Amino acid sequence: MKQFAKRMVCLLTGILMVLAMLTGCSGTPKDEKSDSLVPSSTTEERGVLRIGMECAYAPFNWTQSTAEVANGDTAVPIYGTNDYAYGYDIMVAKLLAEELDMDLEIHKVEWSSIVLGMNAGDYDIILAGMSYSTERDQSVDFTEPYYVRDNVIIVNKEGAYANASGLSDFTGASCTTQIGTSWVHYVPQIPEVEQLTYYETTAEVVMAVSMGTADCGILDEPTALSATLANDNIAYIKLPAEDGFTVPEGTSLNICIAVKEGESALQKTLNDALVAISLDEEKMAELMNTAIEVQPLGD
């Protein structure tokens, strides 16, 4: 009888051990529980709007070492760095984030790889002073414009073209601009132009003109105005309609937010938010003027 009882105890103990092992392997799986803690890959469910921008294109966006801004606003931390980003793009991004009840995450990236980074999933959108073009529209989708710009020519105040007033006055000039932008399509409109190497950033374009490496450069008016405030050697010329640029086929003066191709839900969300924040021409001008006023000159 005692031997039988011992055998029963051993049997029950074994059964309990097996059940404990099965419970550990089944029930709520550990991996499944961990997965539930991982944020959704969709922008809205994650609650964070991840934005790619150069942070080197004042007054649209720039890098600064502190969060303080002269207008009392606060710059946004740049992901993975100790620096901060501010400018027109950040001001618009903050308005959108507030409207959407989302946090901002700014990713600093070189212009030449900015679309690749978004398509690789490094960030959700590009809000970086990017103009619409049919070529870009083949690889990304665009929102409605959040700014409309004019393009101008920058010159050295002491250079040969300082007194130019129309496009024809630049005949034979050497010209540069930023690579990968719609501005490269404007350079050939200068009669008998000498096309120079294009630069990675607008700051390099300004420096080339300031140093006399190039007779002139093509930028948008806000960037050119910022350049004149930061560099005493630079002036810019706004061309008259009768002797000025024509918008090249397939390009636009509209500055838009880019999303991954096919991200129609996010595109609509952003378009609705742009309407909600009432970003009309007057407000665009107000924000841009503020960005120009508070940019850190000489940085």
Predicted regions and their residues:
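C-terminal motif of bacterial Sec signal peptides marking the signal peptidase cleavage site
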Residues: 20-24
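Beta->alpha turn/N-cap motifs
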Residues: 53-57, 107-112, 121-133, 156-157, ...
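A ligand-binding cleft/hinge motif common to bilobed small-molecule-binding domains
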Residues: 113, 129-139, 186-189, 210-211, ...
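Extracytoplasmic small-molecule ligand-binding "clamshell" domains
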Residues: 31-129
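Periplasmic-binding protein-like
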Residues: 147-155, 230-271, 295-299
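Bilobed "Venus flytrap"/periplasmic-binding protein-like clamshell domains
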Residues: 55, 82-98, 130, 149-206, ...
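Ligand-binding clefts/hinges and TM-proximal coupling segments of bilobed small-molecule sensing domains
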Residues: 27-32, 182-199, 237-238, 268-299
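Acidic, polar ligand-binding/catalytic clefts
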Residues: 94, 98, 103-169, 243-249
